[in-house]
């Protein structure tokens, strides 16, 4: 949905630099543009198809789009019922002043011009999932805190996604290893009353296109859900394929 341009704010992941984009740029506040698209889609569904849609959405994202979903939930918690996020366990936000955006909310008001809505955020059901072998693929351009190649899909080490010093502080506070960091993050969120779970899917990788990546499971789930939804819709209208 969103492109990634070199030397440009990381739109795909709602990086902090996205808030510095000029308001006359077509990509200004891309998150707010997505909200407008959602509202327009609701209007079309209701007015043109006569269907009733829920006030809040089911937000799904995997890998980069999972990171987008994490941050979109921070920015617009009032419109989300459930956030289903995969392959993004290294950068789970905590709505606290202990961290700055995109891992926390210390600078939230200065970036967005509004106060953080903790009540709405606390009403979101967060469901995280990640493959057991998520950290096995290594980057050829990033190193971890010990000088070794960093896990490719751990955004804590990717400065386009998480600013370098912010990532270092996160790892120092919550853990260098991604699964440990995620576990500690989940415990903090649970202590804050956030409805969150984190499932590790055994014997699965991030995405190697060989049939054992977690994303293949997600694609299958989405396709099956879409097909069953269309089938039920046609049955309710008295249609047959």
Where does each model-flagged region fall?
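Short beta-strand immediately N-terminal to the catalytic nucleophile in serine-hydrolase-like folds
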Residues: 59-61, 86
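Surface-exposed acidic, glycine-flexible loop patches that form ligand/cofactor-binding
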Residues: 46-52, 113-120, 188-192, 227, ...
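C-terminal catalytic histidine-bearing segment of alpha/beta-hydrolase fold enzymes
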Residues: 157-169, 176-241
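Conserved alpha/beta-hydrolase
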Residues: 1-10
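Short glycine-enriched nucleophile-adjacent loop
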Residues: 66-77
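Alpha/beta-hydrolase active-site loop
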Residues: 18-50, 57
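The feature captures the conserved acid-bearing segment of alpha/beta-hydrolase catalytic domains
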Residues: 82-192
């Amino acid at each position: 949905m969103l492109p990634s341009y070199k030397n440009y704010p990381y739109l795909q992941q709602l990086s902090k630099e996205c808030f510095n984009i000029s308001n006359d740029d077509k990509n200004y506040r891309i998150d707010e543009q997505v909200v407008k698209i959602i509202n327009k889609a609701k209007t079309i569904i209701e007015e043109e198809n006569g269907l009733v849609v829920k006030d809040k959405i089911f937000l799904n994202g995997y890998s980069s789009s999972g990171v987008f979903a994490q941050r979109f939930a921070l920015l617009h918690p009032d419109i989300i019922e459930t956030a289903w996020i995969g392959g993004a366990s290294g950068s789970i936000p905590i709505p606290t002043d202990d961290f700055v955006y995109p891992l926390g909310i210390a600078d939230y008001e200065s970036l967005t011009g509004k106060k953080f809505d903790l009540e709405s955020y606390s009403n979101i059901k967060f469901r995280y999932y990640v493959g057991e072998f998520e950290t096995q693929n290594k980057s050829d351009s990033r190193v971890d805190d010990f000088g070794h190649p960093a896990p490719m899909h751990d955004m804590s080490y990717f400065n386009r996604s998480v600013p370098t010093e912010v990532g270092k502080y996160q790892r120092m506070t919550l853990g260098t290893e991604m699964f440990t960091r995620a576990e500690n993050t989940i415990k903090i969120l649970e202590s804050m009353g956030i409805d969150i779970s984190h499932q590790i899917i055994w014997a699965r990788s991030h995405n190697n296109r060989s049939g054992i990546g977690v994303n293949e499971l997600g694609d299958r789930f989405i396709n099956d859900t879409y097909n069953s939804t269309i089938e039920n819709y046609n049955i309710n209208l008295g249609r047959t394929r």
